[in-house]
Amino acid sequence: MRLFYQRISLLISLCGFFSAAWASDVQPASSTGLWQRFTQNVAETWHHSPHQDLYVPAITWHNRFTYDDEHIRRYNERPWGAGYGISRYDEKGNWHAIYLIAFKDSFNKWEPFGGYAWEKQWRPFDRYQDIHFGAGFTAGVTARDNWKYIPVPALLPLASVGYKQLTFQATYIPGTYNNGNVFFAWLRYRF
C-alpha cells in the first residue's frame, strides 16, 4: 500500500509540474521573462504538438573515472524500457517535447522520468538537411527505488544527433565519487 501512495505522489508531482500547461492560454514567449517563457513553451507544447514520439533506452554508462571497479561490476548498464512523448518544432526550428519514460536504472529497478525538453537545432549541411544536431535541456521529475520512490526534480543537459525522424539523444547526470556521473542515452522516433 505504501508503494501505491508513493506512486500516486509521483503522479501528483508530475501534474503539478505541468499545471501551467493545462491551465494557461498560450501567449507570445518573446514578451515575458524566463519563467513565463518556460511555462508558455510548455503550454504551447501541450496544446499544439503535431508529433508523437517513441523513446527506447539505449545505454547507461557509469563514468569509469568516478567509480571503483566493485560498483561498476554491480551496476546495470543495459537499460530497457520505453517512453512516449509529444513534440513540436517552433518558428526558429527548435525542438520542444513533453514526455514520460520508464527504464531499468543502475540497480535494475524501474525508474520513471517525465518532463519537458527543449533543444536548439542545427542543420549544418546544406546538401543533407535531413541530418540534424541539437543541444538543450530537460526539466522533469524522477523517482527511484533506492530513494523510496519519492519524487525528485531534475534539470539536465541534452544533446542529440539525428537523421530524419530518428534521433539519438543523451544526457549526463552529474554526481560525486561512486554516485551519479552517468551518461544515459536513448533512441527517439518521431511519428
From Swiss-Prot:
The gene is pagP. GO terms for biological process: lipid A biosynthetic process. It catalyses: a lipid A + a 1,2-diacyl-sn-glycero-3-phosphocholine = a hepta-acyl lipid A + a 2-acyl-sn-glycero-3-phosphocholine; a lipid IVA + a 1,2-diacyl-sn-glycero-3-phosphocholine = a lipid IVB + a 2-acyl-sn-glycero-3-phosphocholine; a lipid IIA + a 1,2-diacyl-sn-glycero-3-phosphocholine = a lipid IIB + a 2-acyl-sn-glycero-3-phosphocholine. It comes from the Bacteria. This is Lipid A acyltransferase PagP. GO terms for cellular component: cell outer membrane. It is found in: Cell outer membrane. Keywords: Acyltransferase, Cell outer membrane, Membrane, Signal, Transferase. Coiled coil: none annotated. One of its GO terms (molecular function) is acyltransferase activity. The record marks 177 as: Role in the phospholipid gating. It is an enzyme of class 2 (transferase). It comes from Sodalis glossinidius (strain morsitans). Transfers a fatty acid residue from the sn-1 position of a phospholipid to the N-linked hydroxyfatty acid chain on the proximal unit of lipid A or its precursors. The active site is at residues 62, 105-106. The lineage of its organism: Bacteria, Pseudomonadati, Pseudomonadota, Gammaproteobacteria, Enterobacterales.
